[in-house]
Amino acid sequence: TKVKSSKKFDYIIIGGGIVGLSTALKLQEADKKVLILEKEKSVALHQSGRNSGVLHSGIYYKPNSFKSNLCIRGRELMLEFLNDNNVPYRLEGKIVVDQDMNNIESLYERSQLLEMSGVKILQETELLDKEPNSKILQGLFVPQAGVVDYKSVAQTMSGIFQDNGGEIEYFQEIVGITEKKDQKTVSSKKDSFTADFLINCAGLFSDKVAKLDGLHPKVKIIPFRGEYYEIRSQKNHLLNNMIYPIADPDLPFLGIHLTKTVDGRIEAGPNAVLAFAREGYTWSKFNLSQTLETISYKGMVKLGRKYIKTGLDEMYRSLNKSAFVKEVNRLIPDIKSEDLVKRPAGVRAQAVSENGELLDDFLFEEGNKSLHVLNAPSPAATASLAIGEYISSKVLN
């Protein structure tokens, strides 16, 4: 490989998703010379551009975890960023629902612990005021939640980063990382680049990049596809904002929810189906070596045993539209199968440990002159600027 530029950078960031871009902006604020290497033709083509577009409140996550702290801080920073850069968003809150009142009450107690103002338990009549077409009897209203298009957020970030002298190199799939004389050299199939420090924000491939850097991560990224449907526009009046079920405490996925997007469409989803490729956006996208790697991983074998029924249920819902509709009807009864139109799916990069745990919190691992983001599923988009702040404070010291 030829050395692409004799220019030396302070930092190389692998991955032009929203976490990589946020980190780049924070390092740039400290006057650092930053290069982003992205394997695609533009930024935010994977997780950052294929998600529910929710600005999360932080209410779901264990207090004082990375997810909780960085989501709450990140939401503040994100709102500031959206306002400063005229990126459209809506902040009209969401309703969290559960059959079991105890779950709603414990979530309410957590909101009080986190000093979230305006969160309240709604009974049937108040719920019908907010969502007259739902069939929910009880729920929690969380005013801090909103919606935004994270792909346009990422594109805005990329514009600012480059206007301020930052560089992004596209079509750079990383094949090697070496180190000599305190320098990191990162090689793609066609070029190599040098910097003082490396930051891995490679999302679905973050564990592989960590291995190239000589780390032995105790987790593997397992890809879970999340499929979405859009409700036909004639039925757009059926939802005002967002309705979410309370997550299964054992699974880090939030379950099928209904969201009114920034541009006024209603989306239903996502489910969570094991994907047969790291970028397996459809059933037909199959990568043999990646699939063998997934199913032979001892953590996956243990996980599979534990969640075989859940996994089969999710697959059934993916292959059987009426099963998906049934889930949606638990929230809003008037939506029929013919009202649902397929949307592009997303794939979540979910870290799974060797003992079969789905890692619930964000995970960062330090290497020699490197830092690796090894688990950044939802709410990482909401938290992105706070993750960037956290990473830059670690690497600048």
Predicted regions and their residues:
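N-terminal Rossmann-like FAD-binding beta1-loop-alpha1 element of flavoenzymes
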Residues: F9-I36
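Glycine-rich FAD pyrophosphate-binding loop
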Residues: Q28-R50
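Helix-loop-beta segment of a Rossmann-like dinucleotide-binding subdomain
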Residues: Y61, P88-D98, E124-N164, Q183-K189, ...
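Dinucleotide-binding Rossmann-like beta1-alpha1 core, especially the glycine-rich loop
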Residues: G53-E126, I136, G255-I256, R265-E267, ...
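Flavin-binding catalytic cores
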Residues: H216-K218, K235-N236, T261-A345
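C-terminal catalytic lobe of FAD-dependent flavoproteins
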Residues: L303-N397
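Helical element adjacent to the flavin cofactor pocket in flavoenzyme catalytic cores
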Residues: L140-F197, C201, F205-K208, A383-K394
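Flavin-dependent oxidoreductases
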Residues: S22, I177-N287
